[in-house]
Amino acid sequence: MKRTVIACAVVGLMLWMVPGTASAQGGDVIKLPPAQTGGGMPLMQALKLRQSTRGGFGPDKPLSMQVLSNLLWAADGVNREGGHRTAPSAADWQNIDIYLTMADGLYLYDPIKHELKVLGREDVRAVAGQQPFVTEAPLNLIYVADMARASFGGKRMPEVEETWSYANTAFIAQNVYLFCASEKLACIVRAMIDPAAIAKTLKLRPEQKAILAQTVAHFK
């Protein structure tokens, strides 16, 4: 009995030491490891290698926790005081949320805390697009604009909120493209999505709208 208790304690300690496991707070939150922001491929070389890859991906193996952390930080992480991000945002709305669909579940990225909120443990990758390869890739990002945050002094501006939200999304998507080029990962941004199906699966509010999706995978 004593050995069993000790063994359980050791297993618990090992899980606590694995990034995103012990810090998962009962499975609701996954704390990402700090992003590695030093080094990397020179910008001009990454621009030269940037490309869109449609299917033909390699093995459906998940990205490592560290690569996922680096990717999300590059996409729209906090890079200076005041909560400002790696991607510009019109009027500093910061109104684009990044949802992740992977084989093991659905998640929402919190850039301020640099962690993932677990929204579900089912494989819902198919909702991320209409192309067959979205279910083959280890990661699909879904960019959702929150129009409730697209305001000036609390006043909504419907005449510009959608256009500016598309621009904000594009900034983030390009950051992901450059990161993937640097890490030699396959990537493609996609507009062929079903916003209604996404809204239902992600349980979005009426003020939220799916803008684009982006697939990340390993090359074959």
Where are these regions (language model features)?
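Bacterial N-terminal signal peptides
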Residues: 8-18
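A solvent-exposed interaction/effector surface
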Residues: 22, 198-201
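A glycine-rich helix N-cap at a beta->alpha junction
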Residues: 203-220
